[in-house]
Amino acid sequence: MPDLYAIIRIRGRLDVPPDVDYTLKLLRLHKKFHMVIYPSNQPGLKGMLQKAKDWITWGEINYETLVELLRKRGRTLGNKPLTDEFVDKYLSKYGIYGGIQGLAKALLEGKIKLHKLEVIKPVFRLHPPRGGFKRSTKRPFNDGGELGYRGKSINELIKRML
């Protein structure tokens, strides 16, 4: 069962090198505070994360945070909120039952990939974190900043950004 990476763009569009900008477009991170979810074993993902590590932060998302994220920020085509009824109606053909909790469980178990579902938007638009960033947005997480790999502590940041 692969981990599920939550990837958030922290820095804006100014002074981004063309190769990094292209990588961010491939990840669907077009704007600041946009977030995507990919399985950690996705081919080519690790190289893309390393290429864009000075503009993004990422880590493993847990079940509770994923359910809360899907409830508050999940959108369907037509920019309508993601609901339990919608999941039961449109995703039953993928074997997903139990509403948003069932969708979150299927994502974490690797049964489906969010970016492959055509009826749910793969990008989550988040708010800036409540209370602001605790550290510099120009330094790596391990060096006292907010960028790069942060492991399980991504969940605290996501909850502040919902």
From Swiss-Prot:
It holds the Pfam family Ribosomal_L30. The keyword Ribosomal protein applies. GO terms for biological process: maturation of LSU-rRNA from tricistronic rRNA transcript (SSU-rRNA, 5.8S rRNA, LSU-rRNA); translation. It comes from Staphylothermus marinus (strain ATCC 43588 / DSM 3639 / JCM 9404 / F1). The lineage of its organism: Archaea, Thermoproteota, Thermoprotei, Desulfurococcales, Desulfurococcaceae. This is Large ribosomal subunit protein uL30. Part of the 50S ribosomal subunit. One of its GO terms (molecular function) is structural constituent of ribosome. Gene3D superfamilies: 1.10.15.30, Ribosomal protein L30, ferredoxin-like fold domain. It comes from the Archaea. GO terms for cellular component: cytosolic large ribosomal subunit. The gene is rpl30. InterPro entries: Ribo_uL30_ferredoxin-like_sf (IPR036919), Ribosomal_uL30 (IPR039699), Ribosomal_uL30_arc (IPR005997), Ribosomal_uL30_euk_arc (IPR035808), Ribosomal_uL30_ferredoxin-like (IPR016082). Belongs to the universal ribosomal protein uL30 family. HAMAP family: Ribosomal_uL30_A (MF_01371_A). Transmembrane segments: none annotated. Keywords: Ribonucleoprotein, Ribosomal protein. SUPFAM superfamilies: Ribosomal protein L30p/L7e (SSF55129).
